Amino acid sequence: NAVVSFAKDRRARRLNSSKPCFQLESRSRVFVWSEQGLGDEVMFASLIPELLALGNPLLLQCDPRLEALYRRSFPQAEICRAGDVDEARYDTQIPIGDLGRLLRPDLASFARSPWGYLKADTERIEEMRRWVRSTGKRYAVGISWSSINPDTGPSRSLPLEQLIDALVKKEDPMSQSMLAMYV
């Protein structure tokens, strides 16, 4: 059995495989591999529910930091960490970023995108909720999403100013004062 390997350059990971690229008509075991960074893996994961709905057995590769999240979110898929994968485990392969080409061919197809496709750890949520309540304090939560990619990062990052309306309650003096400290 051949074992596929990945290029070491994180910005340009490539799969060395003898297996053909997955096509929508294929009825095969599909290996979806991650060729980009963590943020892209999360973004393109929105396509996984549609891919699973096609009925193909799925081997989904992810960054180790996403493994537990993906196991909860996509229980029908077999989840594997980045690294070498035996070709005997799949018939076709596709980089996760290429799924958009197949599943989002036009603007209307974005309406099919599922909301809430990632499933939080409910036990951890309850644990955190109990801890926050036990402190008796109010907590401020910060949000940051930025990309370090010099080519596409600026168009895929959110400056705090764009989030103000969603984050600040106009009638809440505390949120107003917290925001003033950072803007």
Spans of model-derived segments:
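Catalytic machinery of carbohydrate-active enzymes
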Residues: 1-183
